[in-house]
């Protein structure tokens, strides 16, 4: 499965933004231990973008060589994992959570399943609650919302807005 259109994305603070024109291919969840560590999570959702249709439109990511053949791109300011770049490949992988609209790309496969946490299949059965129902309730949710410095899910001319930092 591949999807054809224009995708934009970036880090949480807005220092790094990117654009993909055309197809995002092979959307998947990678459970390998390297991706777990790189994401600080149980898996890393990725999809590949052809290099010639991929562009960094703002800032410059930091890069970490996780092996001789792979580097991982991230925001140096906020730490958001953004890219998995197998250097010899004709594409770069973007992290699906960094897309401006992550609902646009649904994973179709799982990789690195030998490292998948054993209780992964049980996640959908966990109790659920809205953001404002957690610790601190509505008051905490309002304080976070009103002081939010997260970049919006669309391109802006500059970020952050004047006087917000």
Where are these predicted regions, by residue range?
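A short Gly-Trp-Pro
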Residues: 1-165
